[in-house]
Each structure stands twice: as structure tokens, then as C-alpha cells.
Amino acid sequence: MYFYNLVKNTDPEIAEAIKSELKRQQNKIELIASENFVSIAVMAAMGSPLTNKYAEGYPGKRYYGGCEYIDVVESIAIERAKKLFGAEHANVQPHSGAQANMAVYFAVLNPGDTILGMNLSHGGHLTHGSPVNFSGKLYNIISYGVDPETETINYDEVLKLAKEHRPKLILAGASAYPRVIDFKKFREIADEVGAYLMVDMAHIAGLVAAGLHPSPVEYADFVTTTTHKTLRGPRGGLILCKEKYAKLIDKSIFPGIQGGPLEHVIAAKAVALKEAMTEEFKNYQVQILKNAKALSTRLIERGFRLVSGGTDNHLMLVDLRNKGITGKDAEKILDEHNITCNKNAVPFDTQSPMITSGIRLGTPAVTTRGFKEGDMLEVADIIHDALTNSDTKENILIRVKALCEKHPLYKEFDE
């Protein structure tokens, strides 16, 4: 564990915390839909000497000297992002998905302008207009949700709201929506009311890159994403847009909302983007979907109710009300059995956001470990047994350990 040895002589407390976190990741089954495990190459790029360099500005136009190699790194990242997603322009500097979203808002909106976005409790994101977030404080937010019967987006309702409120920007994308989103339909709605169309594809970027989910790039004026999650890169953000908006977006990031970019993270983004161009990565994304189908199908067989009846992507929402257990309690119980997930509101939830009636499950991280469909059937059975007391805790922990040992994680660090 090279980083442990490098850190422990200076700071043994932090070194021990790092070591413990590695062991947690190795010995638990990670089902949080927004998490993944980066490659050693991505991790190494983040720990490189690039972290030492200030580089305010953009390649070829910096406010500091000595940026010639930084320019090489960032230019490669930009070109790879454009090529991977077929975009006219890319900004790789956002520190996070939230920063990417903020930059788009600040580029084309004024305080008080109207945004039409997905309700957080129906699968949206904090930055899509939640009243506790800057987006909900600065802008007039109109929210659309899912149909009570189908639990999928009702595009007729979105159009109706758009005609009624005439938003300046319509936002598509979600953090907990298990179905394919029709970006073409959103483009038609935006055109009908003269609105910008922005798509936040943070959760599905890897699937889009592999051609397994319709791409929003040809339809949206702006596309934002994180670079982790299904894209399996470092924690960070990315903005794609039409060339005509390039200067607006770049100015909005710097000097608008950020100062110096994190060039060590941008290097890691570049490495991850190169990995995403491989056949191996596409096969990985195919397996994510296969694993999600296997997990969701088995959970339904074991009596769990899935929001919308299943999944088209990497995640699923499990409504636990028929099991008489809250999302908060389920998260805690599963964690005690070495399975990590997160509590999550389900559409029309009556529980508070800190309690919830459901959990969100995803397959990107376990698929990176090498889990296949058969493993996911066992995972579903373990979830059932843990939440219904159908097996002893001791036996379940043995079953989880067997899966983790079958598919070791970062075994290079154990040498």
C-alpha cells in the first residue's frame, strides 16, 4: 500500500484512516449508485506533481507562467471529452457536477429567471431547484415529476408546465430515475417555448459514452456531468456545449465561479476519458446493465416493489413500504451486514428526506469488481434475507465475504 507508507511517517492518523477506508471498500459490497472504483492510473494521476501548479485561465491563455505542460494535459482532456461524446466544445475545469450546473445557470440566466426542472423527491437533484440549494434561492423554480400511475416522466405534463410558465431554461436529467429519458422530446418542448435545454447526465455519462443510452449532446444546448459515477473517473465535473456558447461557458467557470483549476484532477479526467474510449469500457457498461437487470428482477421475485417496475439503466429505487421498514433503517441494517447503499425518497413519499420510504441501489461499483449476473442474484437474496431476518447475521456476513473474496478490489495494494 504505497500511499499508506508514504503518509504514515508524516501523519499516522490520516494514514490509518486511509488504510481503514481501503479495507472498508474491499470488504463491503458497494451498491451506492453514484459511487465507483477508479483505476490505479486515474488514482496515480490525482497524486501527481500537477497538484503543485496554479493555472488560472485556459490553455494558451494563462495568468501564470510555467504552464506549458499543464496546457498539454488540459488540452488532451478537452479533446478527449469532445471526441468521446461528439461535442463541439468541452470545459474540463468544473470542480464538481454542482459547479458545472452553477456555471451554466450563471452563463445564461439572471436571478429570478424561471427554470423548469425535475422535483428532487421524484428523482431530480439538489442543484435542479431544491429550495435549500443556491438554485432554488436564486431562480424561480417550477418542478415537474413523475406520473402517479407509471412513475415515469409525463412529457405532456412537462409541455403543459412549460407553456404555462415559459421558463428560460428547461433541465432534464436526474439522480434517482431508473428509466431512459427522451431528450429529443425535451428538445421539442424547449423549442416550443423558446427555452434553453440543459441536460445533467451525471448518472448516465458512462452509458452514454458507450452508446447504451441515447445521447443528449445533439439535442441539448448544454450538457453537464460528473466524471465519476458510471464514467469511472475522478470526482469532478465537465460541461459540453455548442460552439456558439463556448465563450459564455468558459467565462462562467473562470473567472466567474472558480479560480485556479485542479490540474491533477484534470489529468485524472483525461486518463479516465481515454479508458472510456476502449472496447473494455463498453463491455463494462454492458455488464452494468446486465447486473442491474439481474438485481432488479430477483428483488421483484423476492417481493420487493421497484419504482416504475424496474430499470433501464444502472440504478433502481426500492419502495420498502410493503416491507414495513424505512429507508433509513434499511440502510443501517444493510450496512451492518456489509452492504452499502443509501436511503432515498420514492415518488410521493410521505416520510422526511432523512427517513424516506426507499433505498437506491446501483451496479457500477460491483461491476468494476467483476460481479456478474449470478453474483447479483445472490446479492438480491442477501438483501432480502438481511431485511426480513430470513438468515442469521453471521451467515449473511459469511456470504458477503465470499463474494468480496471472489472479486477482490485493489489487490495490488495488499502486496
From Swiss-Prot:
EC number, UniProt record: 2.1.2.1
The superkingdom listed in its UniProt entry is Bacteria
Q: Give any GO molecular function from the UniProt entry.
A: glycine hydroxymethyltransferase activity
Q: InterPro entries in the record, alphabetically?
A: PyrdxlP-dep_Trfase, PyrdxlP-dep_Trfase_major, PyrdxlP-dep_Trfase_small, Ser_HO-MeTrfase, Ser_HO-MeTrfase-like, Ser_HO-MeTrfase_PLP_BS, SHMT-like_dom
Reaction equation(s) it catalyzes: (6R)-5,10-methylene-5,6,7,8-tetrahydrofolate + glycine + H2O = (6S)-5,6,7,8-tetrahydrofolate + L-serine
Q: Where are the transmembrane segments?
A: none
Q: Which PANTHER family match?
A: SERINE HYDROXYMETHYLTRANSFERASE (PTHR11680), SERINE HYDROXYMETHYLTRANSFERASE 1 (PTHR11680:SF35)
> What protein is this chain from?
Serine hydroxymethyltransferase
